[in-house]
């Protein structure tokens, strides 16, 4: 055995900017790469859009036509909101799409007893939609106030790398129930998709020099095309003709209901279902989801900043981004998207898979969202891709997003018992508490908090059902209180590495990555 060289024992250097990218936030790739990677970002967020509509619309009494319009509306607003965030928000290459966090309060509003007397399904759909719109508008106002008034800036100023690790990690890991459990709904389609994606993205791209572009840049697209054709062959061969309705829904590639229900051309517009209905308890329920979504978006944006090659966001930039996210949710409520907008976790993972963190790519993906929403018939064809294929993609993409949280450990002293305590307790309870809330509701039909106030029940159950939110609260409080007075704590928690980014003017790279376009920074300066 050869002796170990001294240089091999040197500790890995700390990297404030992720070095494993081919194109960073300010370096756009060639146009062919830009278009192909941008289309993949659209394809990835499409799965979330279809899943949200599939869960909520039938509960409201809507059919295929209503579901198609909702999908079209979510896509259109996602494109608009992504452009707003990339141009005027954080300016990070983050896709803004529908958030899973809003599903819980949305379902609670839909199942409210006051709608039980509505017999006609379409009438029930319209009334519940209008109630959701009112609640979303209030939730958006809350986020806009928190962002634009600088309240979130105060939170970020005291955030250390140690406190950020748990909730950035659980922003990805906390969505595990949308990943492999979705694959198992049609294992003969989902599992091959998962295996192919891993082979193409992580093995073939390094082994085959001639096909490196296809595998490194288009692994998701190639995987989806191959498995979609495979699913079409299984469907045409009658493999699911004798299976149950649940299996057929998950596996069949000819879900023509969405295609038939979609118009050829349609432009979503504000209040297309009528004027919003503002109900006190509905608004409070949605406010809790807005708070949880705010934390999850922050975790996702930290992951995006890593995978785009940018430095850590200054607090004022984070606050600006959250403010624009609030504006996005208000637009969602006006047009009727069922759920609010948040930074897409899966698209953050796609930045790592493609190694392309360019801002221009995300702008192109937003244009794809808008195009396929306006020409809804074409978008409906892609929306008919079996959901287990998307679930297979999420197994890799959510994991990569979680990996961005692990990368922050480079700033921390892992030989400190304080560090181990904060990391372990926040990660463990961040997974354990939400799992308890989910299992409890699965068995009893309601959450552990079950008082006479429905709004209070939903608020508490929503917050403690979010792994990232639970982890963020625990890690932040523990990091800011436990042994805070000891001299070594600042170094152990990685505070000195991020101290230069706590003000916009302390590091020149902040101006390079986060300044507003069109000279707007002169009129809206960052602090």
From Swiss-Prot:
UniProt keyword Membrane, yes or no: yes
Regulation: Inhibited by excess of xanthin, uric acid and ascorbic acid, and by 100 um N,N-dicyclohexylcarbodiimide and 30 um carbonyl cyanide m-chlorophenyl-hydrazone.
Pfam families to which the protein is assigned, alphabetical: Xan_ur_permease (PF00860)
GO cellular component, one term: membrane
Membrane-spanning segments: 43-63, 68-88, 92-112, 132-152, 163-183, 189-209, 219-239, 284-304, 361-383, 387-409, 427-447, 458-478
Keywords recorded for this protein, A-Z: Membrane, Transmembrane, Transmembrane helix
Lipid metabolism keyword on record: no
GO molecular function, one term: transmembrane transporter activity
Family: Belongs to the nucleobase:cation symporter-2 (NCS2) (TC 2.A.40) family.
Descriptive protein name: Nucleobase-ascorbate transporter LPE1
């Amino acid at each position: 055995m050869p002796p170990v060289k001294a240089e091999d024992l040197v500790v890995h250097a700390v990297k404030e900017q992720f070095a494993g990218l081919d194109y960073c936030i300010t370096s756009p790739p060639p146009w062919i790469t830009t278009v192909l990677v941008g289309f993949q970002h659209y394809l990835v967020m499409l799965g979330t859009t279809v899943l949200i509509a599939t869960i909520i619309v039938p509960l409201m009494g809507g059919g295929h036509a209503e579901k198609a319009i909702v999908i079209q509306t979510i896509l259109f607003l996602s494109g608009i909101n992504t452009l707003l965030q990339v141009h005027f928000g954080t300016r990070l290459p983050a896709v803004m799409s529908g958030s899973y966090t809003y599903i819980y309060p949305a379902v609670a509003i839909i199942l409210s007893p006051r709608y039980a007397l509505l017999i006609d399904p379409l009438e029930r759909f319209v009334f519940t939609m209008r109630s959701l719109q009112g609640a979303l508008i209030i939730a958006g106002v809350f986020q806009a106030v928190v962002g634009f008034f600088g309240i979130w800036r105060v939170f970020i100023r005291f955030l250390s790398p140690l406190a950020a690790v748990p909730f950035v990690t659980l922003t990805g890991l906390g969505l595990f129930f949308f990943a492999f459990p979705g694959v198992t709904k049609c294992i003969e389609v989902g599992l091959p998709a998962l295996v192919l994606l891993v082979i193409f993205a992580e093995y073939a791209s390094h082994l085959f020099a001639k096909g490196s572009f296809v595998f490194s840049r288009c692994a998701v697209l190639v995987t989806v095309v191959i498995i979609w054709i495979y699913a079409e062959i299984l469907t045409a061969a009658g493999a699911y003709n004798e299976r149950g309705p649940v299996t057929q829904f998950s596996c069949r590639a000819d879900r023509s209901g969405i295609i038939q229900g979609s118009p050829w051309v349609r432009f979503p517009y504000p209040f297309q279902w009528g004027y919003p209905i503002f109900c006190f308890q509905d608004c409070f329920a949605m406010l809790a989801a807005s708070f949880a979504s705010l934390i999850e978006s922050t975790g996702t944006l930290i992951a995006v900043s890593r995978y785009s090659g940018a430095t850590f966001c200054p607090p004022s930039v984070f606050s600006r981004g959250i403010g624009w996210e609030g504006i996005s949710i208000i637009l969602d409520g006006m047009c009727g998207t069922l759920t609010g907008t948040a930074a897409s976790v899966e698209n953050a993972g796609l930045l790592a898979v493609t190694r392309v963190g360019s801002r221009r790519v995300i702008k192109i993906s937003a244009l794809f969202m808008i195009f396929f929403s306006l020409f809804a018939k074409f978008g409906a064809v892609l929306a008919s891709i079996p959901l287990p294929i998307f679930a297979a993609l999420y197994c890799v993409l959510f994991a990569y997003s979680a990996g961005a949280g692990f990368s922050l450990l480079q700033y921390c002293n892992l030989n400190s018992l304080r560090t181990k305590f904060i990391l372990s307790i926040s990660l463990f309870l961040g997974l354990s508490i939400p799992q308890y809330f989910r299992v409890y509701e699965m068995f009893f039909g309601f959450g552990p908090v079950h008082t006479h106030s429905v709004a209070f029940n939903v608020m508490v159950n929503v917050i403690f059902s979010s792994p990232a939110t639970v982890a963020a609260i625990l890690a932040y409080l523990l990091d800011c209180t436990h042994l805070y007075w000891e001299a070594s704590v600042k170094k152990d928690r990685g505070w000195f590495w991020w101290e230069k980014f706590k003000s916009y003017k302390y590091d020149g790279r902040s101006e390079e990555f986060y300044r507003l376009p069109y000279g707007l920074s002169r009129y809206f300066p960052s602090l």
